[in-house]
Amino acid sequence: MCGILGCINFKFVPGSLDSISHRGPDGSGVKNFKINSHDVTLAHRRLSIVDVSENGAQPMASGDGNSFITFNGEIYNHDTLKPKMKFTQFKGHSDTETLVNYFNEHTISDLKDLNGIFGFAILDQAKKRLYVARDRFGVKPIYYYFKNNQLVFSSEVRPFKHYIDMVYDRENVTEGLKMRYVGAPDTIFTDIKKIEAGQVLTFDLSQEEIVLTKEYYIKTPKMGSRKQESASLVKEYGQLFEQAVERQLMSDVEIGVLLSGGIDSALVAAVAKNKSAKPLKTFTVGFKEGLFASDEIEMAKVTAETLKLENIAVRTDFVDFIEDLKKIIRIVEEPIATNSIIPMYSLSKLTAEHVKVVLSGQGADEPLYGYRKYKGLIFLKHLERFSFLRKGLKLTGMKSMKKEDVRRFYDAAVETDMLTAYREYNSISSGNELGKLLNKTGLADTDTILKRKQGLFKEKWNARIPSDKAIISFPFLDLRNSLADDLLMYTDKLMMHFSVECRVPILDNDLIEFIESLHHSYKLSFSKGKIIHKQFAEEYLPASIVHRKKIGFATPASKWYKTHKQLIEDIICSSKEIGKIFNINAIKEVLNTHEQNQNGEKQILLLLSLALLME
């Protein structure tokens, strides 16, 4: 796991690579090329995990010297790619060497063969093309700027300030407050984009004018139709889960496991222990004792003791909440509305004191219907089938109810367009709320922005959604949108800030393809989620852990916001950039009434993170 950087037709600035040194403290490299009239630079910061010798240093050349790569990530199946190659003279055993030689012989369409997490750039000198690609679920981020025949790309945003003026985009900021994150390809900056999950960008350098083409290298899977005898499916699920964890134990350095009080990380830890020849440490974060009815650390401790694994925990209270949040937001570089980012910072710091690599249980809730909100999809299924029910719902008056999850369900339920319904189902701010918050033309301006963003979302997904049924497509979209651009994004940034690689076994290609092929009844009922997941988990874990009530990661956010209310208001309302976009009086109303709004805390954190980013 590393940091990558590159540019075309810019003079390379060494300080830009230094700005991501935390992603790769074990080494660095820069290579310059001349392709026709274009000046190309590939740069790299290295975190040594597989083949820690100099044979793994980057940028790395293919055996014949034609292709060069700068690579961030892991290819877990790289050994299975070697028999498909003519090249055999490997200097080491790194997946980077496999990758650069594989694509020196194969086409970029063969990206679908890679099972791993990655963001990389490959320069093919013979073809005069630069390829920049991101893994299919977006575990590893890549940002880029392409304008006026110039390109910059990087694992993080901070290098861009060495090359371009960074201008905030009002519409993208508004979108963040609507959806709680800014989804790829957009960022809060006008000219900086994110490569989308499962996307490859090709820059053709054969002519004076660089030509960019974008394509998705993964076809939409067949989803939600597979049915057969339950026991055989549980067995197959278990085999794929075990295979996924075993693959991701690939490392020449010590590996640990992030352990919460939930089933997902517990199952990953249990299988990892079973498959690993080396002892594993587990890591947990929690808050001061007595703060919540349930204690994350105590629950994780029970799991670790059951599995006979060492557990290292840290308790935090974030007394200096604002100062800590300033550090966190500068690391993450994007606006955030998820309070769990705050304890994740402490967990990342703790983990770095012991290991370079950790496995996490992230990625289960979306494909396996683990979130409470997915129960509502069962009702939406009936509304889609019987249109008169949707018409009747419009007459109920539910729209006027103050409970936010009811409002979101209503907005989605009465919407006949599935992609529009998806956005409403996942929003943290209604159109009316945004209309009040935006300055200048208010509601009319908001309506224009939201319609434009909705149109772009449809353009992105219309041809790729697997079904017009919400119960199939909503989890599919969550996995490739909110998971990639929110949870996975900030986990990568925080872990890599402390030079730790975080792996996600549940997002293994083969495992997800199997999960998504299943009929939803194997995953969700009115009373249960993750059904097949829990059935397999019973082979490794006691029922008390498998069926422990899902509580999510609780944070004392309400206490933080009360304690620091005036300081938060001062930070947000004194921001000149915030004042250009939002109505300050409306922001003060959000701050004063957040306890009556189910999404009030998310809105405050989003606005606060924006203000801190814009300082």
Where do the PLM segments sit?
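PAPS-dependent sulfotransferase catalytic core
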Residues: 541-597
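Phosphate/pyrophosphate-binding loops and the adjoining catalytic core of nucleotide-dependent enzymes
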Residues: 483
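In a subset of proteins, long, contiguous C-terminal domains/tails are tracked
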Residues: 1, 529, 583-615
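ATP-dependent adenylate-handling active sites, centered on carboxylate activation for C-N bond formation
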Residues: 8-11, 126-133, 139-151, 220-451, ...
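Cysteine-centered catalytic environments shared across enzyme families
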Residues: 1-332, 344, 348, 538-539, ...
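Short amphipathic alpha-helical segments and their helix-coil junctions
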Residues: 81-85, 453-470, 516, 580-597
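A Lys/Arg-rich helix-loop hairpin that forms a DNA/phosphate-binding surface
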Residues: 90-91, 502-507, 578-580
